[in-house]
């Protein structure tokens, strides 16, 4: 049996188990990563897969960013600022439905400028505080926050790794995501999708009309964590404008810049807290409450995806898309969008987009057309496709991890009740808007 076929079988078994045994997702992913590493590294003769490849597959920038933000979130929660923000939200909206949608919109706005995972970690404590005050389940609000952050990540150059990949490949700057070559760019397609998905959320939560219970305003005990959270947002935005070094140690630091920022701010917060309290209790609490299961799950999935990439599965999918599209631009655009949605629901969209960008460029050259409509279609499909399943995007995995720590195990069916209508609405609107401006006009 060929390496290609075995890789597909292993990958299929992994994802079936991930869906059917949600409590053990981290161990399943870890086991799969070990199997892929040993098999490709020691047994398969036609693929070179070394320890360096395994280590290189793990995105330490993302893991450090998640870990650092998780720690800052612990400080943020202890300061009681999320409770105060929850009090403000409760005073501004009439019922639970409007409060949930408002939090999802807030997550989307923040995520347009900050990494999706960091956004979920920032907004989730507010949602949890609102739900605790109202004595309702936080499952639906957290899912809404996760999928909203994924949607808006494609809006700007700094919102998501896939946007950064496209910007670098197509030589697009921050403002090109708003207006490009005299036409409305991808930002507007995403924002129209965000408006329509807000209506979808209003419909999905139409029965949550119970009035909000108001209480006395919470008193914030420490404002330092709030400044740290704001610092994360500002510094992550500024870091996205740093020029990429040519190589060496500076390039390594550049590739880890978001993670380094979050970890440094966490250390600063812990030092300030220790100086204020003369104790190390908060450091112990941060270490204890870190979501190690989510970190292990993500690290393992990075290796699994690298495994099927090395086995040629992603390249084969790209070739298949080219064969199906032929010379019809609209058909090719349609195939790229919806195939990207389906593929990204199950595999990490970063290696997929990396693989497809040169493929799309070649297809456009063959068809003698500009590649931008295909670039934007690829970005929309690949970014939003991860929204469909609970393990399709890092933000979803993070949200599920937060809920698990709160005692809620979320099944795929429960997640997809929100994610599927949300994603279909966002994809269809983006698909039509992009084709209107870049395929017709």
Describe each PLM feature range.
Residues 49-139, 294-367, 371:
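Membrane-embedded alpha-helical segments and adjacent helix-loop junctions characteristic
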Residues 16-23, 106-115, 146-158, 338-352, ...:
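Transmembrane alpha-helix interface/packing and boundary motifs in multi-pass membrane proteins
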Residues 1-78, 84, 182-319, 417-441:
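Hydrophobic transmembrane alpha-helices of multi-pass small-molecule transporters
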Residues 130-226, 370, 397-432:
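Membrane-core helix-loop-helix motifs of multi-pass transport proteins
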Residues 26, 61, 98, 139, ...:
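Residues that define the loop-to-transmembrane-helix transition and helix capping
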Residues 85, 118-129, 142-143, 155-170, ...:
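Re-entrant/interfacial helical elements at transmembrane boundaries that shape
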Residues 135, 179-189, 300, 330-441:
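C-terminal transmembrane helix pair
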């Amino acid at each position: 049996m060929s390496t290609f076929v075995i890789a597909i079988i292993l990958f299929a078994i992994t994802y079936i188990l991930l869906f059917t045994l949600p409590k053990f997702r981290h161990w399943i992913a870890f086991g799969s990563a070990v199997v892929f590493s040993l098999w490709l590294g020691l047994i398969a003769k036609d693929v070179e897969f070394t320890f360096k490849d395994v280590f290189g597959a793990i995105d330490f920038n993302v893991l450090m960013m998640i870990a650092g933000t998780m720690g800052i979130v612990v400080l943020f929660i202890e300061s009681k600022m999320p409770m105060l923000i929850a009090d403000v939200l409760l005073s501004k909206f009439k019922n639970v439905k409007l409060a949930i949608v408002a939090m999802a919109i807030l997550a989307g706005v923040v995520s347009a400028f900050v990494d999706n995972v960091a956004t979920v970690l920032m907004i989730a404590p507010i949602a949890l505080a609102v739900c605790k005050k109202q004595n309702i389940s936080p499952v639906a609000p957290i899912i809404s926050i996760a999928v909203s952050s994924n949607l808006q990540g494609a809006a700007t150059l700094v919102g998501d790794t896939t946007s950064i990949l496209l910007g670098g490949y197509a030589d697009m700057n921050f403002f090109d995501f708003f207006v490009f070559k005299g036409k409305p760019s991808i930002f507007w397609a995403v924002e129209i999708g965000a408006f329509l998905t807000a209506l979808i959320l209003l419909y999905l939560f139409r029965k949550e009309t119970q009035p909000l219970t108001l209480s006395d305003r919470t008193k914030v005990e420490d404002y330092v964590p709030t400044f740290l959270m704001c610092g994360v947002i500002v510094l992550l935005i500024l870091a996205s404008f740093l020029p990429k070094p040519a190589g060496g140690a500076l390039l390594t630091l550049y590739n880890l810049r978001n993670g380094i920022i979050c970890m440094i701010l966490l250390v600063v917060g812990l030092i300030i807290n220790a100086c204020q309290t003369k104790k190390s209790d908060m450091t112990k609490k941060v270490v204890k409450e870190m979501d190690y299961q989510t970190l292990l799950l993500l690290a393992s999935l990075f290796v699994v995806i690298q495994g099927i990439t090395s086995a040629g599965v992603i390249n084969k999918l790209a070739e298949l898309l080219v064969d199906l599209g032929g010379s019809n631009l609209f058909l090719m655009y349609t195939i790229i969008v919806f195939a990207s949605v389906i593929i990204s629901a199950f595999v990490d969209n970063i290696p997929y987009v990396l693989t497809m960008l040169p493929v799309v460029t070649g297809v456009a050259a063959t068809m003698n057309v500009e590649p931008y409509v295909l670039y934007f279609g690829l970005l929309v499909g690949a970014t939003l496709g991860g929204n469909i399943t609970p393990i399709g995007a890092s933000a979803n995995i993070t949200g599920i991890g937060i809920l698990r720590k709160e005692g809620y195990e979320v099944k795929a069916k429960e997640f997809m009740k929100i994610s599927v209508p949300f994603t279909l609405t966002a994809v269809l609107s983006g698909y039509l808007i992009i084709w209107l401006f870049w395929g017709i006009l």
